[in-house]
Amino acid sequence: SDGEVAAISAADGDRLWRVELERPLSGGVGYYDRSLYLGGADGSVLQLSADDGVVEWDAAVSSEVLAAPAVSGDWIIVQTYDGKLLGFQPGADEPAWTFTSDVPVLTLRGTSTPIVVGANAIAGFGDGKVVAVDVNSGNVSWESRIGIPQGSSEIDRIVDIDGAITQQGIELFVASYQGRVAALDSRTGRKLWQQNVSSVTGTHVGFGNVYVADVDGTLSAFLRTGQGVRWQNIELGYRQLSRPTPVSSYVATVDFDGYLHLLSQVDGQIVGRAKIGGDAARADMIAHNGGLIIFADNGQLLAYDLETLD
């Protein structure tokens, strides 16, 4: 968040390069064709060379960018905190198109990370909707409501989609706060199935399961076919779990106290645990060569071999 960007060797942890951008960074890092894409708290979007960190492109947007831009072909897709989805062409100062969602009075601080599927840019918004926008025209291809606001207070009616949307084939898996986890047809937005859940970290897929960490600490494996729940683990209640990440035959999550937990993808039993430090790790973990790469909230970048976990 302090404007430092570094490239670290996944093999041995050596630093390959480091740059200071002198601006606060607020989103993750996107990658496409040897370039990195980042968003800033000052309402900026940047493209850096993945080889040396040199800034290749810099544009201004209407609000801070809290998630990594998505890039596909000739389009850079940016989601902003004020409910907009923007389509930039490389090198352009202004977006070619803008989609603006309805922003509720009260929302969580965050946004989903947009993805590109075929000709559509797909993102979740604070009003509980998933929207697909044609990247070439900026027209809405479809909308699907995942979270339905309920209750008398603005807090009760928060239904943000802030977590990751997972694509597998033609299916999309998405979860909302105080709403549902659902499977959608990526071509039409048609809802294939849904289950009640409240999540701010989104979904992941493995072993025929759709994994979701509920805000109450329940980690669930829903059958990808929509035929119910394969298993649920309630041992990590209210520990603010990170997005579940499949790796090998396990699913991994980090809690608010800095503990990494490994669960069996088959039955959800906890099979390993390690202390990664004094902080949580809200950034998505990366499964790499049968292990995990974790970026902790305190700025540490860690690589774990699963065989070393107790």
Question: What kind of region is each of these model predictions?
Answer:
Residues 1, 40-41, 80-81, 125-126, ...:
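Structural signature of WD-repeat beta-propellers
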Residues 209-224, 228-262:
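Loop/turn-rich, solvent-exposed surfaces of beta-rich toroidal or solenoidal domains
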Residues 14, 43-44, 54, 58, ...:
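Tandem repeat domain/solenoid detector
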Residues 6, 46, 86, 131, ...:
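WD40 beta-propeller blade core
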Residues 214, 236, 255-258, 263-310:
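Hydrophilic extracytoplasmic domains
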Residues 16-32, 55-72, 95-118, 143-167, ...:
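Extracytoplasmic beta-rich repeat domains
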Residues 9-12, 49-52, 89-93, 135-138, ...:
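Short loop/turn segments that connect beta-strands within beta-propeller blades
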